[in-house]
Amino acid sequence: MKEKTHPKYEQTTITCVCGEVIPTGSTKKDIKVEICSKCHPFYTGVQRFVDAGGRVDRFKKKYGM
């Protein structure tokens, strides 16, 4: 196998907007998510409206559209 072809795998945290922090390993430093297993309707049994419009607005803002 060739050396130095794989990205560095290190300890990182996944942070949800609900406040849940999940330690894990990844090639990325910090990962931020909008929905995790603590607040996802499938796991909680409580349905809630997911703001899809906010995602579109963030995309447009990010790419200057």
Swiss-Prot record:
It comes from the Bacteria. Pfam families: Ribosomal_L31. One of its GO terms (cellular component) is ribonucleoprotein complex. Gene3D superfamilies: Ribosomal protein L31 (4.10.830.30). Zn(2+) binds at C16, C18, C36, C39. GO terms for molecular function: metal ion binding; rRNA binding; structural constituent of ribosome. The keyword RNA-binding applies. Keywords: Metal-binding, Ribonucleoprotein, Ribosomal protein, RNA-binding, rRNA-binding, Zinc. Transmembrane segments: none annotated. The keyword Repressor does not apply. Binds 1 zinc ion per subunit. Its cofactor is Zn(2+). GO terms for biological process: translation. Part of the 50S ribosomal subunit. Binds the 23S rRNA. Belongs to the bacterial ribosomal protein bL31 family. Type A subfamily. NCBIfam families: L31, PRK00019.1, PRK00528.1. This is Large ribosomal subunit protein bL31. The gene is rpmE.
